[in-house]
Amino acid sequence: MKIAVLFFGATADAVGARELELAASAKTAAKSLIDQLSKDHPALAKHKLLIAVNEEYADPDTILNDGDELALFTAVSGG
């Protein structure tokens, strides 16, 4: 199955892209894709990530389906 992965802010900088399309096996959890991305792009692992699946906040254990959109971003804070 194919998953569109969108990167925002620091996650885009860490990966060097705003969007990637990844192949995944059926019943893959979002965390599995994030772990693989972190191995391929070690700078990504330095960030505490928030995720959304199909434009809704999601848990890392969310099972992805073919054609889903996984968005990765960091929490925004100010001071």
What do the PLM-derived regions correspond to, one by one?
Residues M1-G78:
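Ubiquitin-like/PB1-type beta-grasp interaction modules and other compact soluble beta-rich domains
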